[in-house]
Design a protein with these regions (language model features):
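Charge-rich, well-structured scaffold segments of protease-associated domains
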Residues: 1-150
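His/Glu-based metal-binding/catalytic segments typifying zinc-dependent metallopeptidases
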Residues: 118, 147-185
Length: 185
């Protein structure tokens, strides 16, 4: 859709159950915030070797998607229906875009995300002091960034247009049909 989510999540035991009274919540927060705000760079960009590995995995996942005919049909229909609108942009991107991913481009996108993202903090199962400490740690990280969060995307309806029919042929015994409709005027 128009908004994509990146979730950094940590689950662990409460401080009160730590064997030696450790402040586990602080450690969880440090780990999550370190992951989000201090990724591993080689020089000033993401590690080229790691990017190469991730590109291979992404390529494989996108190529394998065609084996799940229902999902493939739905995603192809969304791509056709929404076109270039923000709702048509897939979180994973598209197979033809994988080769263009570079450590530099990904690093630039990462910094843009930090600058413009709407950020929500959810802390569950902690006392008020621990929750406040986590919030303060996040605010400290954010204070080092020149932020300009974008407004949240409004719900959109695609404009009415002539029906489009797209057919792809596969060597299968079962067909899939996906139909999308709009309330757009």
């Amino acid at each position: 859709g128009c908004s994509h989510n990146l979730c950094v999540s940590i689950t662990g035991i409460k401080d009160q159950f730590a064997l030696e009274g450790e402040k586990l919540t602080q450690e969880y927060a440090a780990l999550a915030l370190g992951t989000a705000f201090h990724p591993y760079f080689v020089g000033s960009t993401f590690d080229p070797e790691a990017v190469g590995i991730e590109k291979q995995m992404l390529r494989k996942a996108l190529e394998d998607e065609v084996n799940d005919k229902r999902l493939y049909c739905q995603r192809q229909a969304n791509r056709e229906f929404f076109g270039d609108s923000p709702a048509g942009v897939r979180q994973e991107g598209y197979l033809e875009e994988v080769d263009g991913l570079t450590p530099e481009a990904l690093t630039e996108a990462y910094y843009e995300m930090l600058r413009t993202a709407n950020i929500e903090l959810i802390v569950l199962g902690c006392d008020e002091a621990s929750t406040t400490a986590v919030k303060d740690a996040l605010l400290t990280e954010l204070s080092a960034i020149d932020r300009a969060p974008l407004p949240r995307a409004e719900n959109i309806a695609m404009p009415r247009r002539e029906p489009v029919r797209k057919v792809e042929h596969f060597d299968t015994t079962q067909a899939k049909l996906c139909m999308l409709f709009t309330l757009g005027r």
